[in-house]
Swiss-Prot record:
<dbReference type="GO" id="GO:0046628">
    <property type="term" value="P:positive regulation of insulin receptor signaling pathway"/>
</dbReference>
<protein>
    <recommendedName>
        <fullName>Bombyxin B-2</fullName>
    </recommendedName>
</protein>
<feature type="signal peptide">
    <location>
        <begin position="1"/>
        <end position="19"/>
    </location>
</feature>
<dbReference type="GO" id="GO:0042104">
    <property type="term" value="P:positive regulation of activated T cell proliferation"/>
</dbReference>
<comment type="function">
    <text>Brain peptide responsible for activation of prothoracic glands to produce ecdysone in insects.</text>
</comment>
<dbReference type="GO" id="GO:1905564">
    <property type="term" value="P:positive regulation of vascular endothelial cell proliferation"/>
</dbReference>
<comment type="subunit">
    <text>Heterodimer of a B chain and an A chain linked by two disulfide bonds.</text>
</comment>
<keyword id="KW-0372">Hormone</keyword>
<dbReference type="GO" id="GO:0045944">
    <property type="term" value="P:positive regulation of transcription by RNA polymerase II"/>
</dbReference>
<dbReference type="GO" id="GO:0005615">
    <property type="term" value="C:extracellular space"/>
</dbReference>
<dbReference type="GO" id="GO:0008083">
    <property type="term" value="F:growth factor activity"/>
</dbReference>
<dbReference type="InterPro" id="IPR016179">
    <property type="entry name" value="Insulin-like"/>
</dbReference>
<dbReference type="InterPro" id="IPR022352">
    <property type="entry name" value="Insulin_family"/>
</dbReference>
<dbReference type="InterPro" id="IPR022353">
    <property type="entry name" value="Insulin_CS"/>
</dbReference>
<dbReference type="InterPro" id="IPR036438">
    <property type="entry name" value="Insulin-like_sf"/>
</dbReference>
<keyword id="KW-1015">Disulfide bond</keyword>
<comment type="similarity">
    <text>Belongs to the insulin family.</text>
</comment>
Length: 89
């Protein structure tokens, strides 16, 4: 009995750890998207104008993502918090 309890305890702990390690992709739309971005981006230092690359360079390096916005990536399909954080700053 002691072995089965120990096995169950190890199983539950490993299950909890693995679920916390995986980031769940969710959809964020409308007010929920705006509030989530505000919460995530609060305190993220914004870049000054000198740190921005010229327009023709940014279009070249952005590729297809340059044509999509946060709504395309996180409202029309699920996204992770890491994707939302990429829009901060």
């Amino acid at each position: 009995m002691k072995t089965s309890v120990m096995f169950m305890l190890v199983f539950v702990i490993s299950l909890m750890c693995s679920s916390e390690a995986q980031e769940v992709a969710r959809t964020y739309c409308g007010r929920h998207l705006a509030d989530t971005l505000a919460d995530l981006c609060f305190g993220v230092e914004k870049r000054s104008g000198a740190q921005y690359a010229p327009y023709f360079w940014t279009r070249q390096y952005l590729g297809s993502r340059g044509k999509r916005g946060v709504v395309d990536e996180c409202c029309f399909r699920p996204c992770t918090l890491d994707v939302l954080l990429s829009y901060c700053g």
